[in-house]
Structure formats: structure tokens, C-alpha cells
Amino acid sequence: MKPATAKISSLALKHNLELIHQKAPDSKMIAIVKANAYGHGVEFVASTVEEQVDGFGVARIEEALTLRSKGIIKPILLLEGFFSAKDLPVIAVNNIQTVVHNREQLEALKQTKLPNPIKVWLKIDTGMHRLGVALDEVEDYVEELKKCANVEPLIGYVSHFSRADELDSDYTRIQLNRFLQATEDKGGPRCIAASGGILFWPDSHLEWIRPGIIMYGVSPTDTPSSEFGLIPVMTLTSSLIAVRRHKAGEPVGYGGTWISKKDTKIGVIAIGYGDGYPRNIPSGTPVYINGRIVPIVGRVSMDMITVDLGEDCTDKVGDEVILWGKELPIETVAKHMGILSYELMTKLTPRVLTEYAD
């Protein structure tokens, strides 16, 4: 019997990357490993896929330095750029690449003394309206970056789709056209396709792509990843720690929010919000036990959840429970909860054990 455990498959990870290569065979790949590789373990993921990818993308300089400390030598890109001019010498010494998306970053590059030039990617706002320089500012930024001694001569260009998972929207096509026009004749590498772009917008597969959630076998939409040929890298499991007879009309859990309409058996599973399993979920959220789906009933506790096993169940203490994985797609669980698959994976706490397989 084990407590909450995230089982991570290297074979699934490698399979997904091969599938991505097949979809964009002419593009180089930046593997996104921010947020501890979406909860999968950044050291394991990076070392597993280093030979299959051309670089890594992270959100914080600390994440980049962790990769370097683990012996990763491939290029690493700071997707949000640097937060302080004090970071620039560290970036230069550790051969880290950075996005530039605002005037403050540009001025810091001009004014800081560095031991060697840095590879820079200019982020262009094509319609996400979160980060990036305006379309009418691109030429000025490019000119200033090319004059800066701290910047390597070949500038990269990057942008981000806001609706790549909305196949009936024209907005992605509009963003792509803006990006292509803004970078026309610039000569540097370009990257705009993340997971949604890779799956649904082949015209956006430019010199570089940057897979995130699909690398981990999860769909960027409500559609289960299996329909795209992806295999979940993470299977979240736990164990039944109690099976109890329960009378009709009796409540379960804090606040008595769920009352059984008939005699049944209640299973208690060793996972709760202390492990990162969301607290505010509806009754009926599915889990997988012994080949079938059963519903969560009552409130999620810090360490436990309760499920309705049915009166005639044969489940016993110690049986494995799957919270999500190949048998129960995380997309299905997330949709039932009304949240994103990204949230489920990245919110798991250190209390959840990790097992690396294959």
C-alpha cells in the first residue's frame, strides 16, 4: 500500500517527443520544462530528452541554473526574459539565452558590462497582449539590439498565440500573419508555435517550435490526448486505506454535503489538498479503481478523499487507485473540476512521492 505517488514514464516522454518531431520535421525544438517540468521533475525530464531536443525553455533564471548544475549543456531560453540587470552577468557566464520584451530590459543590456555577448530573442506582441513589443516598435528594437555589443548579432524572434486551441477562430491566423510580416527579411530564427500551434496550425511550424503540455502527453484542449497519439507521462496513484459500510440517509465528510440515497460502501483514499489535489471540486469527480470509474463524494480533506464504491463492491484496503493517467485522462478529470490540466499537474506538493520508470 502506497500513499499518493506520481509515476513518471520515460518511454511515454520519448514517444511524445518523437510524435512532435513527426508533426514538425523541419523545425528545431525548445522543450518547455518550466515549473519543475510541469510537475514531472525537471532533472529527470531534461536528462531523458536532451538528445531529442535542441534546447530548453524556462520561466526563471533559477530554473536555468538548476539545469546547468545538473550537467545540461543544450541552449536554455528564459521565456520571460531577465527580471533584473543583476542577472545579466550570470546569464552570460552560464550561456543562457533571454527573451527581451520591454524597454527596461533593452536599456539594461546596453548599460551592463558583460564578459561575452548574450543570445537574445525579441518577443513581439501579435495579439496576446501580455508580453512583447508592439508591432510598430519592432524595427526600432531590432536596430538598437543590433548596435548593442552585449547582444549576439543573430537575433531570434518569438511570439505567443492566445487562441491556438480554438480551431474555429481566425485570430490565430491573424497573429501568425502579423508575426510573419514583422519578421520578414530579418534573417533570424523564429518561434511562435507552442503546443496548440504544433497540433493544429502546421503553417506556424517555423525554424523553431516549443512544445509544453503535449510533451507530457496532455492535450491543450478538452479532447483526450490519446486522440492525438500522445501518451500520458504521469500517472497519479494512491491507495484505498478504508472500505466502510454506509447507510442510506447518512452524510459523508466535513459539512455533510453529500448524503447517500441508498446503502453503499464508502472508500477512503490517501490523497487530499495537502498533496495538491484540489479542495473545491464537485461530488462526482471520477477516480479509477479496479477497472471502473467511481465518483468522489463529500468534501476533499487535507489527507483523504472519499468515493462511493457501491454496495456490492469487492474493493479492499490496499487496492491501487488512479487519480489520472492512461486509464483516466487528466483532461476528463480537469473538465469535471472546471480547471485546467496544467493546474492539476503543477500544483502537486512535495508530499506526493515520485517514481521514475522505464
UniProtKB/Swiss-Prot annotation:
Domain of life of the source: Bacteria
Catalytic activity reported: L-alanine = D-alanine
Keywords assigned by UniProt, alphabetized: Isomerase, Pyridoxal phosphate
SMART domains reported for this sequence: Ala_racemase_C (SM01005)
Binding-site residues, substrate: 130, 302
Catalytic-site annotation from UniProt: 34, 254
The protein's annotated pathway: Amino-acid biosynthesis; D-alanine biosynthesis; D-alanine from L-alanine: step 1/1
GO cellular component: cytosol
EC primary class: isomerase
EC number: 5.1.1.1
GO BP term, example: D-alanine biosynthetic process
Cofactor dependence: pyridoxal 5'-phosphate
One protein family per Pfam: Ala_racemase_C
InterPro entries per the UniProt record, alphabetical: Ala_racemase, Ala_racemase/Decarboxylase_C, Ala_racemase_C, Ala_racemase_N, Ala_racemase_pyridoxalP-BS, PLP-binding_barrel
Modified residues (N6-(pyridoxal phosphate)lysine): 34
GO MF annotations, alphabetized: alanine racemase activity; pyridoxal phosphate binding
Family in the record: Belongs to the alanine racemase family.
Free-text function comment from the UniProt entry: Catalyzes the interconversion of L-alanine and D-alanine. May also act on other amino acids.
Protein name per its UniProtKB record: Alanine racemase
Source taxonomy: Bacteria, Pseudomonadati, Pseudomonadota, Gammaproteobacteria, Pasteurellales
Name of the gene: alr
